Amino acid sequence: MSRRSATSSGHPKVCACPSGLDPYRLPNHVAVIMDGNGRWAKARGLPRMVGHRAGVEALKRTLRLCSDWGIGALTAYAFSTENWSRPGDEVNFLMTLFERVLQRELESLEREKVRIRFLGDLEGLPSGLQELISEATELTVRNNGIHFNVCTNYGGRRELVLAAQKLAQRAARGDLDPTLIDENSFEAELLTAGEVDPDLLIRTSGERRISNFLLWQLAYAEIHVTDVCWPDFDEVALTKALFDYQSRCRRFGGLDPIAANHLGS
């Protein structure tokens, strides 16, 4: 089954998705909280670091599936501002892992026309990783395939505070009338500026919280929680999430059309 979707260049793209899914009702933007790497490893008697490596493979798999099925954007919560409180050896491992994976996968991302962006306090990352992030961003900025956003050293509250500070600074300089600040001007100062909000949030490992992730952008997202730990998140798990999404009636604060008709009769 094929789906025609517009890439960022405006050209239609023919995509295939699993049988039974409505190709015209897939989310344009999927966000994922990749939880359960440590639990996955512990259940197998393995070090947590093995779980993180397996999590990378799950992310590559998910990106490929989303791209193949015509989903326009994938945003992954890779490392939060709170994750610095983890043991130092684990944090160092993760930073090294990010560097190695980005070095290894950049050519493939470019070949597949993926546009990658890293969202967060990037200046707080190791200098080598910062350089790779700049290289990857510049190399893929004109790509017209799936938008791949990697939230690294990211915190939702911090993002909102920074956006408010930028608007306040503009107002203090006289460049902005405070009475004209609205949702659009606020969104323009967010790290995700220019990206559509997520339609679907997927959280793995059964946890039911959003963990300071995309606090503004997830306002109207549908939320799917699966007990599957992130390293085991595969095509079957993603398909279930999409079926769940398509079973919802998205109301954006309004009434279900059936309920609205009933009230009006």
Curated annotation (Swiss-Prot):
What residues make up the catalytic site? D35, N83 (proton acceptor)
Cited PANTHER family: DEHYDRODOLICHYL DIPHOSPHATE SYNTHASE 2, DEHYDRODOLICHYL DIPHOSPHATE SYNTHASE FAMILY MEMBER
Q: Where does substrate bind?
A: 36-40, 48, 52, 80-82, 84, 86, 203, 209-211
Q: Which InterPro entries match?
A: UPP_synth-like, UPP_synth-like_CS, UPP_synth-like_sf
Q: What is this protein called?
A: Isoprenyl transferase
Task: Enumerate the UniProt keywords alphabetically.
Answer: Magnesium, Metal-binding, Transferase
Q: Which NCBIfam families match?
A: PRK14830.1, PRK14831.1, uppS
Could you tell me the EC number(s) of this protein? 2.5.1.-
Q: Which Gene3D superfamilies match?
A: Decaprenyl diphosphate synthase-like (3.40.1180.10)
* Assembly information from the UniProt record: Homodimer.
Q: What GO annotations for molecular function exist for this entry? A: ditrans,polycis-polyprenyl diphosphate synthase [(2E,6E)-farnesyl diphosphate specific] activity; magnesium ion binding
Which positions does UniProt annotate for Mg(2+) binding? D35, E222
| Family according to the record | Belongs to the UPP synthase family.
Essential cofactor(s): Mg(2+)
- Name the SUPFAM superfamilies on file: Undecaprenyl diphosphate synthase
Into which EC class is this enzyme placed?
transferase
On cofactor binding, the record's note says:
Binds 2 magnesium ions per subunit.
Query: What is the protein's known function?
Result: Catalyzes the condensation of isopentenyl diphosphate (IPP) with allylic pyrophosphates generating different type of terpenoids.
Please indicate if the UniProt record lists Metal-binding as a keyword: yes
- UniProt GO BP: polyprenol biosynthetic process
